[in-house]
Amino acid sequence: MDKLIIKGGKKLTGDVSVSGSKNAALPVFISTILAPGLNEIRNVPFLRDINTTIKVLESLGAVVEGNGNIVKIDTTHVNDVEATYDLVKTMRASVLVLGPLLARHGRARVSLPGGCAIGARPINLHLKGLAALGADIRLEHGYVEAKAKKLKGARINFDIATVGGTEQLMMAAALAKGETILENAAREPEIIDLADILNRMGARIDGAGTDTIRIIGVKELAPVVHDVMPDRIEAGTFMVAAAITGGDIKIHNMKLEHLDALVFKLQDAGVEIINRDNVVRVKGPRRPRAINIKTRPYPGFPTDMQAQFMALMCVADGASVISENIFENRFMHVSELLRFGADITIEGNTATVKGVKKLSGAPVMATDLRASASLILAGLAADNTTEISRIYHLDRGYDSIEKKLAGLGADIKRVKE
């Protein structure tokens, strides 16, 4: 098992390029089930979750070949309709194969999902939506079993905005008979990216990126070439890395408009952000100001940046209040940040962070994907040496982050435990 060793206290400088988005790539890969033939996906990040998705697709009959950041997926012979527990248990997004398999073959059997242990993230909204499209849904021995002779369009109003549920039903409705309206749909940029590939396959989807999405079903979809959007959470993590080290970096291949809420809060904290010719320059202050945040669905402050922003607030001037409104149990990084000398108290879904002048390096343990990033950020800012174990979480969502940070001047290396 690997661990990271960080010698902190170095200001980050230089240029870094953002990889393709994990959260966009996973549904994009799965959407190829709907378009039998050879699909080519470009700007693909090297991640454990990508490898898991490839294994799921191969288990269903797809032939997948990778060459650098380009992955070719031939879904001509996707004839198996079962995604087993062994594959699905490690990654929640695997459940997204349910809708495409149902739309293409009229049946699917998919294990209930796994992934990061950050609270109960039920798929009931996925199942409720598929049932509204005419599917017969049953839960049997930890599996979702779904059948439908032909999915039919429907008006579906989500109880809460759900990214996975919106993606699931967009894909299923693409081949349904008639019109489907998704109300209170998720608005994330990754939804737009999925709609983009589906529309180029021949789907008829309008309104992606708004809370109302209209899908007119078509008889068939055709394979395409698609470039995955840049990873906004990776970009945001680098922005905080510059801020927490008082650094000065330039970030390439990112879309700043995807991070408006984060940019606003960073600027409030005293971080200078300049966007010129699609290159974003981030200059950290001597010491950030304490700022309150509340996580919200997009376009609000992203829950996937909460842990990283908390690390920044650990060294801020003053006290900040951080409210987590998306997921329960998403403060698992707090106990590890305390090992650095941070001053954090939790009450319910709210953390109060009193900034300290300096953190001290410590042995810590990653608990989930974004918590891993927060510990790296704390280690970059801390005096002395930090060791982070269980970094396999990190490999689920960050492509070579330690190499990219080293390229910015960080003293960070991966070693075997």
Swiss-Prot record:
Keywords for this protein: Cell cycle, Cell division, Cell shape, Cell wall biogenesis/degradation, Cytoplasm, Peptidoglycan synthesis, Pyruvate, Transferase
Gene Ontology CC terms, in alphabetical order: cytoplasm
Top-level EC class as recorded in UniProt: transferase
Pfam family for this entry, one: EPSP_synthase
Biological processes per GO annotation: cell division; cell wall organization; peptidoglycan biosynthetic process; regulation of cell shape; UDP-N-acetylgalactosamine biosynthetic process
Residues that bind phosphoenolpyruvate: 22-23
UniProt keyword ATP-binding, yes or no: no
Pathway note: Cell wall biogenesis; peptidoglycan biosynthesis
Record's keyword annotation contains ATP-binding: no
Residue positions of the active site: 116
GO molecular function terms attached to this record: UDP-N-acetylglucosamine 1-carboxyvinyltransferase activity
Intracellular or extracellular location(s): Cytoplasm
EC number: 2.5.1.7
Modified residues (2-(S-cysteinyl)pyruvic acid O-phosphothioketal): 116
Catalysed reaction equations from the record: phosphoenolpyruvate + UDP-N-acetyl-alpha-D-glucosamine = UDP-N-acetyl-3-O-(1-carboxyvinyl)-alpha-D-glucosamine + phosphate
Binding-site residues for UDP-N-acetyl-alpha-D-glucosamine, renumbered to this chain: 92, 304, 326
Annotated function: Cell wall formation. Adds enolpyruvyl to UDP-N-acetylglucosamine.
Similarity section: Belongs to the EPSP synthase family. MurA subfamily.
Protein name, as recorded: UDP-N-acetylglucosamine 1-carboxyvinyltransferase
Organism of provenance: Geobacter metallireducens (strain ATCC 53774 / DSM 7210 / GS-15)
Lineage start: Bacteria, Pseudomonadati, Thermodesulfobacteriota, Desulfuromonadia, Geobacterales
